[in-house]
Amino acid sequence: MFLIDDTALMALIREDVPAGDLTTRSLGLAAEAGELTMRARGAMTVACSEEAVRILQLLGAEAWIATASGRQVEGGEMLLFARGQVEALLAGWKVAQNLIEWASGLASSATAIVAAARAVNPAVTVACTRKSVPGTRALSLRAVTVGGATVHRTGLSDSVLLFAEHRAFGGADALAAQIARLRASCPERKVVVEVADVAEALAAAQAGAEVLQLEKFPPEQVAAVVAGLGPDWRGHVAAAGGITAANAAPMRRRGRRFW
């Protein structure tokens, strides 16, 4: 579970309301009493409804969750309800709405990709990378996890991933030498190696890589890697980059050891 604290939510509020709501204040509406309801526009996987409610609470409104994150809803279903002074409701309205819209879009995409992949193999794992809009990583990872995916890595500190950029500083035998060093230095971590073609994937597996990250491989190249590895290789194959609900199933059909 990704905990989004009040400091992060206050930063979203301050971005949109740095000095109050000029329009509401100028109309003399600030102290009026009001109610706010948010409903789904269409079918979606809900994400960050809890954070949206907290945004309204931080501004002084009373607010309640109607639909928790991770639930799939149809258009028209209530997501949250709030009441309080108009100044608080309108200050938090768009911040909360934009957060739910954006996060639920990520969650819904994750749900669709997971469903497409698991239609081929119910045991497959869909893992999302750390590549996110700067400043939104925790919210992004929260959204994709409530959508049914898991996390590939949260950052550079939690996993071992050998890129070509590392190997560029390792000399002629960088692939084998760096894999060996990582396995010795980080014995409790799987060594993941990003590869650019079939030959490099097979060489990395031979050198001891435990996960092969196939960067933007078409399905036929994924199949070639799986075939080349043979039935005795015990690692994992991960197709990375450009995975959508439309191509998740074809990718999964190309191999057994896949996540």
From Swiss-Prot:
Q: Which Pfam families match?
A: QRPTase_C, QRPTase_N
Molecular function (Gene Ontology), one example:
nicotinate-nucleotide diphosphorylase (carboxylating) activity
Q: What is its EC number?
A: 2.4.2.-
Top enzyme class of this protein?
transferase
- State the InterPro entries in the record: Aldolase_TIM (IPR013785), ModD (IPR006242), NadC/ModD (IPR027277), Nicotinate_pribotase-like_C (IPR036068), Quinolinate_PRibosylTase_N_sf (IPR037128), Quinolinate_PRibosylTrfase_C (IPR002638), Quinolinate_PRibosylTrfase_N (IPR022412)
Q: Which UniProt keywords apply?
A: Glycosyltransferase, Transferase
GO BP annotations of the record are: NAD biosynthetic process; quinolinate catabolic process
Disulphide bond pairs: none
Question: Single GO cellular component annotation?
Answer: cytoplasm
Q: Which PANTHER family match?
A: NICOTINATE-NUCLEOTIDE PYROPHOSPHORYLASE [CARBOXYLATING] (PTHR32179), PYROPHOSPHORYLASE MODD-RELATED (PTHR32179:SF4)
Q: Which family does it belong to?
A: Belongs to the NadC/ModD family.
Could you tell me what this protein is called?
Putative pyrophosphorylase ModD
Q: What is the lineage of its organism?
A: Bacteria, Pseudomonadati, Pseudomonadota, Alphaproteobacteria, Rhodobacterales
Question: Gene of origin?
Answer: modD
